[in-house]
């Protein structure tokens, strides 16, 4: 049985564009995510 290709193809540029800090700061919900992660004391806030 043939399996498909691996779905995770790492790409740092796309990672930052989709989950990055600048993107998070753009929307109200995104800012809420960063605030929540800061409050929780996360080492890494975004990608």
UniProtKB/Swiss-Prot annotation:
NCBIfam families per the UniProt record, alphabetical: rpmH_bact (TIGR01030)
Identification of the protein by name: Large ribosomal subunit protein bL34
Native organism: Mycolicibacterium vanbaalenii (strain DSM 7251 / JCM 13017 / BCRC 16820 / KCTC 9966 / NRRL B-24157 / PYR-1) (Mycobacterium vanbaalenii)
Superkingdom classification of source: Bacteria
Record family assignment: Belongs to the bacterial ribosomal protein bL34 family.
One Pfam family hit: Ribosomal_L34
BP term (GO), one: translation
Example GO molecular function: structural constituent of ribosome
Keywords: Ribonucleoprotein, Ribosomal protein
Gene Ontology, cellular component aspect: ribonucleoprotein complex; ribosome
Keyword Ribosomal protein attributed: yes
Entries under HAMAP family matching the protein: Ribosomal_bL34 (MF_00391)
UniProt lineage: Bacteria, Bacillati, Actinomycetota, Actinomycetes, Mycobacteriales
């Amino acid at each position: 049985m043939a399996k498909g290709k691996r779905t995770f193809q790492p790409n740092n540029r796309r990672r930052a564009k989709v989950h990055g800090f600048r993107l998070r700061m753009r929307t109200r919900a995104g800012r809420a995510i960063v605030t929540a992660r800061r409050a929780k004391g996360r080492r890494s806030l975004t990608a």
